[in-house]
């Protein structure tokens, strides 16, 4: 028997008991984990430094190292996320629909945990805490498979979590970390239907495609983020500059960063020089022929329109109207996050309804597509599929339902 199967058996067994743990005891366990992470903070940062140093020695680009890096401020943000989750309503054992039939049967739809969640993710060690905290509050056990680039960070974080659980009424067997970084272990994980109820891949296109292609366990697909911002002819140009700058520069290595900006042709002569000045010496611009007639930019190819750069690069295209902008998004977007900057109510409403994406914005940065920013305390990932869950997956997306039927002797005639 492989060690992975032993881990999964422990998780499956623990899942039966976890579903019966009270909200009070789950919240107390999360508070003890906050305390444990605080006490182990220096060790977590030291282990993270090992991962960051190894990434730099491999020549990893800065935007990806930023995803890997933990700081005191980021750990504080992680802890605040747990506090938010503690304050949220427990999503399980809630009967949202109850009705009584003519024969006297009372039927209700009750929310229940998924069971055992497997998550496969890249680089970001904060996901370890976010995913676990959401799983615990929603009554789910979790199997974590982070990337080799964050192995030291993840091992120390999971050790701190287990330390907190040992002081609580919740078993430490509800969380397991796969420490073997061999991809063949992932292949095995993807086929363990007997033990794992759902797998969530969270990372780049290659990882997500690998999981979808090889999994027999049900998956919730999180997509890459080729996100667009369309600047309409009626846009407040100062707002547009501020929004695009934030969406591109604040953290370019994340999936909700803007990768392409679409500009209405009527404002392009005025707006493009403003944009170029705002991004000067910070972002490489790649433009369509009409863009390059107005500002200096590298030539954009079809591959550029489809690229999730995760870097200080922005593709720019001039379009004739909102329909051409939407057409471009439909052709190249990844159904993640899309935005329009406009003062035209009709165009805003049209864009909101026509664009097919998990999150669609009017006059705001795409960077808000995030469980923490949405008030969920964290996220298991951002789903770009349409079944079960879509957008940032918080507590309410980590449950399923069952029908409870209560009678007093009824039989089917």
From Swiss-Prot:
Entry keyword NADP: yes
InterPro entries cross-referenced by the UniProt entry: Ald_DH/histidinol_DH, Ald_DH_C, Ald_DH_N, Aldehyde_DH_dom, G-glutamylP_reductase_CS, Glu-5-SA_DH, GPR_dom
Entry keywords, A to Z: Amino-acid biosynthesis, Cytoplasm, NADP, Oxidoreductase, Proline biosynthesis
Cellular location(s): Cytoplasm
EC class: oxidoreductase
GO CC annotation terms, alphabetical: cytoplasm
PANTHER family registered for this protein in UniProt: DELTA-1-PYRROLINE-5-CARBOXYLATE SYNTHASE (PTHR11063:SF8), GLUTAMATE SEMIALDEHYDE DEHYDROGENASE (PTHR11063)
Purpose: Catalyzes the NADPH-dependent reduction of L-glutamate 5-phosphate into L-glutamate 5-semialdehyde and phosphate. The product spontaneously undergoes cyclization to form 1-pyrroline-5-carboxylate.
Protein name: Gamma-glutamyl phosphate reductase
Organism per entry: Alkaliphilus oremlandii (strain OhILAs) (Clostridium oremlandii (strain OhILAs))
Gene (UniProt): proA
């Amino acid at each position: 028997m492989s060690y992975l199967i032993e881990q999964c058996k422990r998780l499956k067994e623990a899942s039966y008991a976890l579903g019966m743990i009270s909200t009070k005891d789950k919240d107390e366990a999360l508070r003890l984990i906050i305390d444990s992470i605080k006490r182990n903070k220096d060790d977590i940062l030291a282990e993270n430094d090992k991962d960051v140093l190894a990434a730099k020695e491999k020549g990893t680009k800065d935007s990806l190292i930023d995803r890997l890096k933990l700081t005191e401020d980021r750990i504080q943000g992680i802890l605040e996320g747990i506090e938010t989750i503690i304050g949220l309503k427990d999503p399980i054992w809630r009967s949202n629909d109850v009705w009584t039939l003519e024969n006297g049967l009372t039927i209700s739809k009750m929310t229940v945990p998924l069971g055992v969640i497997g998550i496969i993710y890249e680089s970001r060690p904060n996901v370890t805490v976010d995913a676990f905290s959401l799983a615990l509050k929603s009554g789910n056990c979790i199997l974590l498979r982070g990337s080799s680039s964050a192995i030291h960070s993840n091992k120390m974080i999971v050790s701190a979590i287990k330390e907190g659980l040992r002081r609580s009424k919740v078993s430490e067997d509800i969380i397991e970390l796969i420490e073997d970084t061999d991809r063949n272990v992932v292949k095995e994980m993807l086929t363990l239907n007997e033990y794992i109820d759902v797998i969530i891949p969270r990372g780049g296109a290659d990882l997500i495609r690998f999981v979808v292609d090889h999994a027999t366990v049900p998956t919730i697909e999180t997509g890459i983020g080729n996100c667009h911002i369309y600047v309409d002819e009626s846009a407040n140009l100062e707002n547009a500059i501020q929004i695009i700058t934030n969406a591109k520069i604040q953290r370019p290595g994340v999936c909700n960063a803007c990768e392409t900006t679409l500009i209405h042709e009527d404002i392009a002569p005025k707006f493009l020089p403003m944009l170029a000045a705002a991004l000067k010496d910070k972002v490489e611009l790649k433009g369509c022929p009409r863009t390059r007639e107005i500002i200096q930019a590298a030539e954009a190819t079809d591959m550029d329109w489809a690229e999730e750069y995760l870097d200080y690069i922005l593709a720019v295209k001039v379009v004739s109207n909102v329909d051409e902008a939407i057409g471009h998004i439909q052709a190249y977007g990844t159904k993640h996050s899309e935005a329009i900057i406009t003062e035209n109510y009709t165009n805003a409403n049209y864009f909101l309804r026509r664009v097919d994406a998990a999150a669609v914005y009017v006059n705001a940065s795409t960077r808000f597509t995030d469980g923490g920013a949405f008030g969920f305390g964290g996220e298991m990932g951002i789903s770009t599929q349409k079944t079960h869950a879509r957008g940032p997956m918080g507590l309410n997306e980590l449950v399923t339902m069952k029908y409870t039927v209560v009678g007093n002797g009824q039989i089917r005639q």
